[in-house]
Regions:
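Non-DNA-binding regulatory cores of transcription-related proteins
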Residues: 65-143
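N-terminal helix-turn-helix DNA-binding core of bacterial DNA-binding proteins
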Residues: 3-34
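Key DNA-contact positions within bacterial/archaeal DNA-binding proteins
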Residues: 37
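Beta-hairpin "wing" of winged helix-turn-helix
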Residues: 49-65
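Basic amphipathic alpha-helical segments that dock to polyanions
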Residues: 42-49
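Append "Primarily bacterial transcriptional regulators
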Residues: 28-30, 46, 76
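Solvent-exposed interaction patches of small proteins and small membrane subunits
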Residues: 25, 31, 56, 65, ...
């Protein structure tokens, strides 16, 4: 799976925060159907990645701290610790015994080209566009 449940939950949290207001974890969990324990884990990552700001106390809550137009799906996946790798052999430092024995691997070359296109596509989609659907939510041709 390229986009994990964790990144899906992160997108849902960001969707709640689109309004620019502070929201409690309980509110976001209830609205977006995210288990509380996962919401806290995800918010820690989003905060560490400077995508959200979390404040504690009576007036605390969570709010956006990034520009969603300048932040891509690729960026979010990186914050969540995902690389969206198509195949294990795309991982840096992967040792392929087949390639060691036979040389160039056509499968790897084709997958590398697909990986590059996927990464470019994920970099081209801003989180705001993804979360709001842009001008026409049914039109995914430019995503």
């Amino acid at each position: 799976m390229i986009i994990t449940k964790e990144t899906d939950y992160a997108l849902r949290i960001l969707r709640v925060l689109l309004d620019g207001e502070k929201h409690s974890v309980a509110e976001m969990s209830e609205t977006e159907l995210i288990p509380n324990q996962f919401a806290y884990q995800i918010l820690r990552k989003l905060s560490a990645g400077n995508l959200v700001r979390v404040s504690r106390g009576a007036l605390g809550g969570c709010e956006l701290s990034c520009d969603l137009d300048a932040t891509s799906l690729y960026d979010l996946m990186g914050v969540m610790g995902e690389r969206g790798i198509l195949c294990a052999c795309m991982e840096p430092g992967y040792e392929c015994h087949w390639q060691d024995k036979h040389g160039r691997c056509a499968i790897h070359c084709q997958l590398a080209a697909l990986q590059q296109k996927q990464d470019e596509a994920f970099r081209a989609v801003s989180l705001r566009r993804l979360l709001t659907g842009g001008s026409n939510p049914q039109d995914t041709s430019t995503l």
